[in-house]
UniProtKB/Swiss-Prot annotation:
Cited Gene3D superfamilies: GroEL, GroEL-like equatorial domain, TCP-1-like chaperonin intermediate domain
Alphabetical GO biological process terms: protein refolding
Quaternary structure (record): Forms a cylinder of 14 subunits composed of two heptameric rings stacked back-to-back. Interacts with the co-chaperonin GroES.
Provenance organism: Mycobacterium ulcerans (strain Agy99)
Any matching Pfam family: Cpn60_TCP1
Cellular compartments annotated: Secreted, Capsule; Cell surface; Secreted, Cell wall
EC class of the enzyme, as a word: isomerase
PROSITE patterns reported in the protein's UniProt record: CHAPERONINS_CPN60
Protein name stated in the entry: Chaperonin GroEL 2
HAMAP family in alphabetical order: CH60 (MF_00600)
Keywords for this protein: ATP-binding, Cell wall, Chaperone, Isomerase, Nucleotide-binding, Secreted
Residues bound to ATP: T29, L30, G31, P32, D86, G87, T88, T89, T90, G413, N476, A477, A478, D492
Major subcellular site: secreted
C-alpha cells in the first residue's frame, strides 16, 4: 500500500490535531460536574459513559496523521487503566497540556530532546513528592469516599467498602448484572470453584438441590477415576472413620461412580464426586491450592502417589463443603497457615512476573480464593443502557478502591498535582531541560482547571486561589467550597494520580521528538457506477 509522509512541524501538528480531537471529547467528563458521552454501537443500544478509556477506544479519525495522534493518546488512557483502573481522563488532559506547551517551545526553537529530559526529571520529582505526601487508607469510610468519587455515587462507595471489609484486600470483588433494581452484595465463604456434583444422586438437600458434607475427608486426584478396585482400599479406611468423602478428580466415571452412587442411595456411605476445575497446568495448580488449603496431598503419578497405595493421611479436611449443580464451596480448610501463606507469596510473585492480562486475572482469582474471599456486587437498572453504564462505573470504582489501599491517597480534584509544583524549584536545571520542567509546571494545573471549567467556574481564578491555599486545601467541585479535601472525603489514590502523570509524560516526550510521520495513503473511493439507462430522456416511470 502507498504511504504518505509528513515532516517537521507539519507532522507534529497533524498528530496534535488528532490528540486534541480525542482529548476534547474525553475531558468533558472530568470531575463531579463532568458530562457524559454517548457512543454509537453498530449493534444494539448506544452506550452512555463518563469513562475516558471507553470513549477513547471508540474514536477513529479519517485523516491518517490525526488518526496516529489519537492512537498515541489512546495508549495513555489504556496504560493508565491497566495499571490503576482509573485516572484515564486525567491522563488524557495532562497529555494534551504537555504536548500543547511542548510543541509551542519546539516551534520557538527549543531542542526536543532537551525538553524531553527536562519533562522526565520533573515528572520523577513530582511522583516522589506525591508518594511522600500520600496518606494510608485505614478506615472503611476512607475506602467508601474514594470509591464514591470514582463512581459518582455514595451508595456504590459504601457497598464497595463493605465488600472489601468482608473479603480483605486480597479478595476478589466481581460485578454482575442483576434482573432486580438496585444494588446487592453477595459474599462467598471459603474457596469456591465452578464445578458441581457429577451425578444428581449425590444431592442431600432435595429442596435446595445441593449436597452438604459436614467435616468431610477430601480426596484430590490429578487423573480420572474409573475402576472401583483403585478406590476400595481408601474407601474402607474412610468408612471406618465414619466421615463423608468428597472426591475432586479430573473425572469420576464407570464403576467407580456407580459404586459411590449406590452406597449413597442405600445410606451406607455419604460421598460426592466433583470434576476438578480448569484445564492442563492451571488444573494442576488449582488442585495444589486445594491441597494446601485443606492440608491434604494431590494423588498424582508425577509425585509417585497412586490411589491403590494412598493412605488416609494424604486426604484433606474441611469443616463443611457445599456442592450445587454448578459450583463447590470448601469452608474452613484444615491446611497449615504457614503453608497457605507461602503459597500466597508464590502466587503473588507469579502475578508480578506475568505479561498476560488473562493469566494475571486467573492468578488473582486463585490468590483471592486462598487469601481472602469472593464478593459479588449485583447491579440492576431500569434500562439496558443504564445497566451497562452503572456496571462499568462500579468496576472502575472497585479498582480505584484497591489502588487506594495499595499505595495510599492524596487530595483529589487535581489539587495534589498543583500543590506538587513547588517541589520543582528543588531541581537545578538549565537551558532546554529547565524549559521542559516548566512545561510540566504548566501542565500540572490542567486537571484542576478542567474540573473547574466543567463545574461552570473560571479556571484561572480557581487555580490561583488553590495555589495560595495550604497543602491539601482546594476546591470541592461538587459543593463549590474551598476546604481540606481529605477531611471532606475528596481523595484520589496516589497510584492513579502518579500513573496518569507518568503515562502522559511518556507519550508527550514521543510527540515532541517526532520529526516525520509515515502513514497509509487514504484509498480513493471507487467511481460510482454509470447510469444503466444510458442517459436516455423521456422515460417516465
Amino acid at each position: 500500500m502507498a504511504k504518505t509522509i509528513a515532516y517537521d512541524e507539519e507532522a507534529r501538528r497533524g498528530l496534535e490535531r488528532g490528540l486534541n480531537a480525542l482529548a476534547d471529547a474525553v475531558k468533558v467528563t472530568l470531575g463531579p460536574k463532568g458530562r457524559n458521552v454517548v457512543l454509537e454501537k453498530k449493534w444494539g443500544a448506544p452506550t452512555i459513559t463518563n469513562d475516558g478509556v471507553s470513549i477513547a477506544k471508540e474514536i477513529e479519525l479519517e485523516d491518517p496523521y490525526e488518526k496516529i495522534g489519537a492512537e498515541l493518546v489512546k495508549e495513555v488512557a489504556k496504560k493508565t487503566d491497566d495499571v490503576a483502573g482509573d485516572g484515564t481522563t486525567t491522563a488524557t488532559v495532562l497529555a494534551q497540556a504537555l504536548v500543547k506547551e511542548g510543541l509551542r517551545n519546539v516551534a520557538a526553537g527549543a531542542n526536543p530532546l532537551g525538553l524531553k529530559r527536562g519533562i522526565e526529571k520533573a515528572v520523577e520529582k513530582v511522583t516522589e513528592t506525591l508518594l511522600k505526601s500520600a496518606k494510608e487508607v485505614e478506615t472503611k469510610e476512607q475506602i467508601a469516599a474514594t470509591a464514591a468519587i470514582s463512581a459518582g455515587d455514595q451508595s456504590i462507595g459504601d457497598l464497595i467498602a463493605e465488600a472489601m471489609d468482608k473479603v480483605g484486600n486480597e479478595g476478589v470483588i466481581t460485578v454482575e448484572e442483576s434482573n432486580t433494581f438496585g444494588l446487592q452484595l453477595e459474599l462467598t465463604e471459603g474457596m469456591r470453584f465452578d464445578k458441581g456434583y457429577i451425578s444428581g444422586y449425590f444431592v442431600t438437600d432435595a429442596e435446595r438441590q445441593e449436597a452438604v458434607l459436614e467435616d468431610p475427608y477430601i480426596l484430590l486426584v490429578s487423573s480420572k477415576v474409573s475402576t472401583v478396585k483403585d478406590l476400595l482400599p481408601l474407601l474402607e479406611k474412610v468408612i471406618q472413620g465414619g466421615k463423608p468423602l468428597l472426591i475432586i478428580a479430573e473425572d469420576v466415571e464407570g464403576e467407580a461412580l456407580s459404586t459411590l452412587v449406590v452406597n449413597k442411595i442405600r445410606g451406607t456411605f455419604k460421598s460426592v464426586a466433583v470434576k476438578a476445575p480448569g484445564f492442563g497446568d492451571r488444573r494442576k495448580a488449582m488442585l495444589q491450592d486445594m491441597a494446601i488449603l485443606t492440608g491434604g496431598q494431590v494423588i498424582s503419578e508425577e509425585v509417585g502417589l497412586s490411589l491403590e497405595t494412598a493412605d488416609i493421611s494424604l486426604l484433606g479436611k474441611a469443616r463443611k463443603v457445599v456442592i450445587t449443580k454448578d459450583e463447590t464451596t470448601l469452608v474452613e480448610g484444615a491446611g497449615d497457615s504457614d503453608a497457605i501463606a507461602g503459597r500466597v507469596a508464590q502466587i503473588r510473585a507469579e502475578i508480578e512476573n506475568s505479561d498476560s492480562d488473562y493469566d494475571r486475572e486467573k492468578l488473582q482469582e486463585r490468590l483471592a480464593k486462598l487469601a481472602g474471599g469472593v464478593a459479588v456486587i449485583k447491579a440492576g437498572a431500569a434500562t439496558e443502557v443504564e445497566l451497562k453504564e452503572r456496571k462499568h462505573r462500579i468496576e472502575d470504582a472497585v479498582r480505584n478502591a484497591k489502588a487506594a489501599v495499595e499505595e495510599g491517597i492524596v487530595a483529589g480534584g487535581g489539587v495534589a498535582l498543583l500543590h506538587a509544583v513547588p517541589s520543582l524549584d528543588e531541581l537545578k536545571l538549565s537551558g532546554d531541560e529547565a524549559t521542559g520542567a516548566n512545561i510540566v509546571r504548566v501542565a500540572l494545573e490542567a486537571p484542576l482547571k478542567q474540573i473547574a471549567f466543567n463545574g461552570g467556574l473560571e479556571p484561572g481564578v480557581v487555580a490561583e486561589k488553590v495555589r495560595n491555599s495550604p497543602v491539601g486545601t482546594g476546591l470541592n467541585a461538587a459543593t463549590g467550597v474551598y476546604e481540606d479535601l481529605l477531611k471532606a472525603g475528596v481523595a484520589d489514590p496516589v497510584k492513579v494520580t502518579r500513573s496518569a502523570l507518568q503515562n502522559a509524560a511518556s507519550i508527550a516526550g514521543l510527540f515532541l521528538t517526532t520529526e516525520a510521520v509515515v502513514a497509509d495513503k487514504p484509498e480513493k473511493a471507487a467511481a460510482p457506477a454509470g447510469d444503466p439507462t444510458g442517459g436516455m430522456g423521456g422515460m417516465d416511470f
